[in-house]
Amino acid sequence: MKILCIFLTFFFTVSCGPSVPQKKTREVAEKKRECQLVRGACKPECNSWEYVYYYCNVNPCCVVQEYQKPIINKITSKLHQK
């Protein structure tokens, strides 16, 4: 009975959550998707008319230089006093 309890504890501890390779695969897929959203491509090296947006796994995400990164402006509201 004690062995069964130890086995079940080990089994449930090991089986919880995704394994490390699954997490890595998911992260790589997310980075490739983000790269495609900015009209880029993950490839071994960028051409002269492209720049590195960020790295997908080990390869750079190459984006054409015409693409501008979005500028985030803070929206501030001021109350007008009369």
Swiss-Prot record:
Residues 1-16 form the signal peptide. One of its GO terms (biological process) is innate immune response. It holds the Pfam family Defensin_beta_2. Keywords: Antibiotic, Antimicrobial, Defensin, Disulfide bond, Secreted, Signal. It is found in: Secreted. One of its GO terms (cellular component) is extracellular region. Belongs to the beta-defensin family. Has antibacterial activity. This is Beta-defensin 113. It comes from Pan troglodytes. The gene is DEFB113.
